[in-house]
Amino acid sequence: MTAATKASVAAPSAPLEKGKIEVTPVLDVADRDRFIKFSWEIYRNDLHWVPPLLMERHEFLDPSKNPFFLHAEVALFLARRAGEIVGRIAAVEDRNFNSFHRSRVAYFGLFECVNDVQVAAALFQAAREWARGRGLESLLGPMNLSTNYEVGLLVEGFDSDPYLQMTYNPPYYGELIEKCGLEKAKDLYAWERSASPPPERFARVADKIRAHSEVQIRSVNLRNFEAEVTRIKEVYNAAWEKNWGFVPMTEKEFDKLARDLRQFVVPALALLAECQGEPIAFSLTIPDYNQALKKLNGRLTTYGLPIGLLKLLYFARKIDRVRLMALGVKAGWRRRGIDAVLVVETIRRVHRLGYQGGEVSWTLEDNDLINRTIEASGCTRTKRYRVYRAQTG
């Protein structure tokens, strides 16, 4: 690990010992590789786990490549018993989050653990001690590495594969975390529906709103990518500002996320709503590339040959479901049905493009306005994710 990387990864001065369990900080690239690959041990026989791309995980956790690290400190910990890795956790101080919310919160995330409460307790003790050492008063998570990325622990809905950029974990994680003294902070919902036409009444209301509104709905123009990203960014920061857990993305973070997602975007499913040229809402629906990534076991190449890449290209043609991953409306335009218009238009386009159905995720459990809209569109709630909290003291 480079000197710059070491400076970005804070750690306690000595290993934490808990009986036969030793928790140590990740301080070099080799340990970071072990940290990432430990997931394969946990999910070895799990039918629903989708292995992440190893290349992407290394880039995500590399402070020199991920702009999140410009305003955050991240400590990665590995738990070992008799030299064998049995757990991992990340502790995060996001200075932008704490500044925005005037709080002293540490995230925890990237949690993986064998089914042993002593191992889990040792990992959370390491995270708590790290956070206390930085003057932080509470833990919140799982966040991988913030609410702008993967969020929450799956607590309901273990019988199907996760969609792209949604979390997945063994059912026993919730019990482990609660036995370590954490409690519920917030639940998040995921919803599913087929690509069948929207309910007649819902569609009729949305069509009437659209016909009598000066709002125009259009597809994102990827040939004018940077300008479109600027418009979406404006809506994103305004629409989500009051949401629980929200933290504004920096310019560099948003631009990187946009570049990363561009390869997955189908222009017909990336919608902007505008009024007299002003962007007021947007929705983003992407094909569920997890259906293809599941076939790769985390690798695009094998022995230098692009075997994984060829598999990805082949199975990408067979993707038959989508994920509506973002839908936001500026505050001054809410309760005018713009969200319903975007949902109906998305459903129709998904059907026209030949997909079989998809997921809407995630929504806050207490966001009644958007949850009612999603339910009225014919969606059924299929998964529940939980964010936990605890004091560091």
Model segments located where?
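Flexible loop/turn segments at secondary-structure boundaries
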Residues: 32, 95-98, 147-149, 198, ...
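Active-site proximal loops enriched in glycine and acidic residues that flank catalytic Cys/His/Asp
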Residues: 248, 274-275, 283-289, 325-331, ...
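Acyl-donor binding region in acyl/amide transferases
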Residues: 98-181, 297-377
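A conserved beta-strand-loop-helix scaffold within acyl/acetyltransferase catalytic domains
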Residues: 39-82, 89-99, 219, 224-328
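Catalytic cores of nucleotide-enabled group-transfer and carboxylate-activating enzymes in metabolic
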Residues: 25, 29-32, 45, 51-63, ...
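Acyltransferase donor/substrate-recognition loop-hinge adjacent to the catalytic core
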Residues: 9-21, 167-245, 269
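TRNA-binding/sensing appendages of the translation machinery
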Residues: 3-5, 15-59, 128
